[in-house]
Amino acid sequence: MTFISLGRRLAPWVLPVALLAAWQGAVVLGLLSTRILPAPSAVLAAGWDLLGSGELWTHLAISGWRAGVGFAIGGGIGLLLGFITGLSTWGERLLDSSVQMIRNVPHLALIPLVILWFGIDESAKVFLVALGTLFPIYLNTYHGIRNVDPALVEMARSYGLSGFALFRQVILPGALPSILVGVRFALGFMWLTLIVAETISASAGIGYLAMNAREFLQTDVVVLAILLYALLGKLADLAARGLERAWLRWHPAYQAKAGAQ
């Protein structure tokens, strides 16, 4: 590994590490009250204690389950609707306007109605996460299919491709970059929605951990929960980027990026 490549790998971490160092220094020097924002070392100690007791693992597992199930349901529906409206003119006429109207309703504003529908159990939280992840994947799937080069489609048809073979070998690969962008957006909305969803009478989860800590003025635990959401969001984005690297190796833009690295 050359010095330049090492620098490229470390560059994204320079600003976060500098901010943490400045944060710790401000608390140690008394420039920042621990009642407002505890030191990173105090947040780390709180996390270590929760890990040791096993409580943090429980909250992480439950939040991860809610996020994963909601993403699978919402993403699956969004992908299916995107395929229908992207591949079929009649599908677009029948579905797109209705989907767009629903998309423009803030899904977090539906919380009172969701509680009436599902109560306060897991179904309400999963429904909100699914609703938050559906539309980014739908829009990018639809956009990706509609922007496949028509000349490529006609060329494939001239070689005898049609039906599912045409979809699998030409349309889907052409739409895949846009679909994966939708996945990255959806993963961000997934954690954003979950933060609010876990305030609905939850008894476990990272959101519950933060709300419970607030009641007891445990600022270090509240900050820990916020940082956990940020870390989980970053890990999810890294996973999506890993899918891009694995599935888009053939794409000229990604080949050029890999060559530059």
Model-derived regions: residue spans:
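Glycine-rich helix-loop "coupling/hinge" segments at transmembrane-helix boundaries
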Residues: 115-116, 145, 192-229, 248-258
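Short cytoplasmic-facing helical segments at TM-TM junctions of multi-pass membrane proteins
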Residues: 97, 140, 144-182, 210
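Transmembrane alpha-helices
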Residues: 127, 131, 164-196, 220-223, ...
